[in-house]
Amino acid sequence: MSKIIDPPNRGKSNTAIHKVQDGAKYPKTSFRGVKTTYNYLPTNESLENWLPSFFLSGANALINKEKLIQLGGFDEIYSPYYYEDADLGIRAWSVGWKCYFEPKSICMHTPSSTISKLKSEKVKLIIERNRIIFNNIHLRGWQLHFFNCWLWLRCIIKLIKGNSTIYKAILLFRENKYRIKKSKEKLLQLCEKTKKYYSVYDTEKYILKKIKKIKYRIF
């Protein structure tokens, strides 16, 4: 994937200023689940080596066709938007394939040009639903248990404050339990086929080890 920048704004000197939207995707996991919103960029802009990326942004990505077909493309369980690109990348890492960031490649992209036209409450609900689905597909064992405990704690706190978004998202998640089960089964079948299985925590450790000697900033 490329570095993604906003369309230019004009500064006081009337020169084009491009804000960086996305860099390489930085892995971040905790008992609260998998975070997909962190990016990192090398401080040395002349660096020419590819950098490992947690996943590839759906805004721009060059993907091996054969591997994409084996992965089954984007999982439609995330329709209409959000988390489908993160899911595809994590599935690729799970079976031993890698995602890379090319620091010299640049893509200009207007962020959320379509989604910004939709009602914000609906967007928030879909994001929360897909976040729950994503974590329930990719977390295992005690990590999944802690995530769901934290989820219900957040839900209760939000309900006390009069916000029912997480509760509604949980209901939508429960409606998709069968599809989630099928998505997990397909991933495990592909892992058996490739004879490899790496958890999100294995992927996080691998990426952090690879970039250990590189100076970078997280945003």
Describe the predicted segments one by one.
Residues 1-73, 77-80, 95:
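Acidic/His-rich active-site region of diverse nucleotide-sugar glycosyltransferases
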